[in-house]
Swiss-Prot record:
GO terms for cellular component: cytosol; succinate-CoA ligase complex. This is Succinate--CoA ligase [ADP-forming] subunit beta. Its cofactor is Mg(2+). It comes from Geobacillus kaustophilus (strain HTA426). ATP binds at residues 46, 53-55, 99, 102, 107. SUPFAM superfamilies: Glutathione synthetase ATP-binding domain-like, Succinyl-CoA synthetase domains. NCBIfam families: PRK00696.1, sucCoAbeta. Keywords: ATP-binding, Ligase, Magnesium, Metal-binding, Nucleotide-binding, Tricarboxylic acid cycle. Residues 9-244 form the ATP-grasp domain. InterPro entries: ATP-grasp, ATP-grasp_succ-CoA_synth-type, ATP_grasp_subdomain_1, Succ-CoA_synthase_bsu_CS, SUCC_ACL_C, Succ_CoA_ligase-like_bsu, Succinyl-CoA_synth-like. Its EC number is 6.2.1.5. GO terms for biological process: succinyl-CoA metabolic process; tricarboxylic acid cycle. The keyword Metal-binding applies. Heterotetramer of two alpha and two beta subunits.
Length: 386
């Protein structure tokens, strides 16, 4: 789960991690009032959307008066911001962060992620802050320093100190930087984060180390033990189809193609998308109905797939283990009748009760195209949507 920058900073502040003073605003008047409360000679008006690259897209403005705050807030609220992370459709700005301006002397990058190769959390740092860290990693990987954290003992002060020296934090501010990194790590562990990223971490003219921007993502599987974090969820920032799918415990991710996919099991779902690509098609989604799907779940899965106007055909690929093929077949027939499906539908069934499942499809009287294998099914649906 993702949250907004201002929400991430609220969490960091509660852990003693230094962030600029700021207020969230939902209207132009609230933005001006927030700037008045801050009383700073310079304020920054920042669009709040779940995407990076806001500055380059014109979503971050520096205001030197209340009039400028009003002007920038009017420009940004309701604007569709397009960044390299939003896709061409962009995201509408519905809230702003009004923040005190900082006298920035130097920008750095600090981040925490789970490294799957070592099964450890890794603390990363670079003095190339304020830029895309992926770009730095690709062009000048030697400028990124890493500290691998032993889960038994957590981040040690000597590791944070070593990283601070490696990225050339001024010596008189190293202790501040160490405290900052230790606090950030505590947030990462306590809140079950998947990413904690500060870009940029800045050194200010008055000798402070603080997070000018903050990104926290959370492991959705751990949210049951973090009701406080769940309250930060902003459904407006999520794909409506993905929100609807989550109500039925369906794992759905929207993609840019035109072939809808319904599969049981994440591995098979990824293989299905791969084979569609192999035969020249483009999957419109990842959709895993899980191992214990009912007819209702199958029906809702169909509705969600069809709510995407780009979908020109559907490929159902089921291997029945716990999931029985006859249940899937009944769900497919019911869903097809209920939604009045007119698009090409290719179904490949294999496993438990497969013959019964095929019989249900054959006797349904519907135009359902059977596939003998995954490759056969992929080829058929790709040809049908061309």
């Amino acid at each position: 789960m993702n949250i907004h920058e201002y929400q991430a900073k609220e969490i960091l502040r509660s852990y003693g991690v230094s962030v600029p003073n700021g207020r969230v605003a939902f209207t132009v008047d609230e933005a001006v009032e927030a700037a008045k409360e801050l009383g700073a000679p310079v304020c920054v008006v920042k669009a709040q959307i779940h995407a990076g690259g806001r500055g380059k897209a014109g979503g971050v403005k520096v205001a030197k008066s209340l009039e400028e705050v009003r002007t920038y807030a009017s420009e940004l609220l309701g604007k569709v911001l397009v960044t390299h992370q939003t896709g061409p459709e962009g995201k509408e700005v519905k809230r702003l962060l009004i923040e005190e301006g900082c006298d920035i002397q130097k920008e750095y990058y600090i981040g925490l992620v789970v490294d799957r190769a070592t099964s450890r959390v890794v603390l990363m740092g670079s003095e190339e802050g304020g830029t895309e860290i992926e770009e730095v990693a690709a062009k000048t990987p030697e400028k990124i320093f890493k500290e691998y954290i032993d889960p038994a003992v957590g981040l040690q002060a000597f590791q944070a100190r070593r990283l601070a020296f490696n990225i050339n934090i001024p010596k008189h501010l190293v202790n501040q930087a160490v405290k900052f990194m230790m606090g950030l790590y505590q947030v990462f562990v306590d809140k079950d984060c998947s990413i904690a990223e500060i870009n940029p971490l800045v050194v200010t003219g008055d000798g402070k180390v603080m997070a000018l921007d903050a990104k926290l993502n959370f492991d959705s599987n751990a949210l049951y033990r973090h009701p406080d974090i769940l309250e930060y969820r902003d459904l407006d920032e999520e794909d409506p189809k993905e929100v609807e799918a989550s109500k039925y415990d369906l794992n759905y991710i929207a993609l840019d193609g035109n072939i809808g996919c319904m599969v049981n099991g994440a591995g098979l779902a990824m293989a299905t998308m791969d084979i569609i690509k192999y035969y020249g098609g483009e999957p419109a989604n990842f959709l895993d109905v899980g191992g214990g799907a009912s007819e209702e779940k199958v029906r809702e899965a169909f509705k969600i797939i069809l709510s995407d106007p780009n979908v020109k055909g559907i490929f159902v690929n089921i291997f029945g283990g716990i999931m029985k093929c006859d249940v899937i077949a009944s769900g497919i027939v019911a869903a097809t009748k209920q939604v009045g499906l007119t698009l090409p539908l290719v179904v490949r069934l294999e496993g438990t009760n497969v013959e019964l499942g095929k019989k249900i499809l054959q006797e349904s009287g519907l135009n359902i195209i059977a596939a003998e294998s995954m490759a056969d099914g992929a080829q058929k649906i790709v040809e049908l949507v061309r």
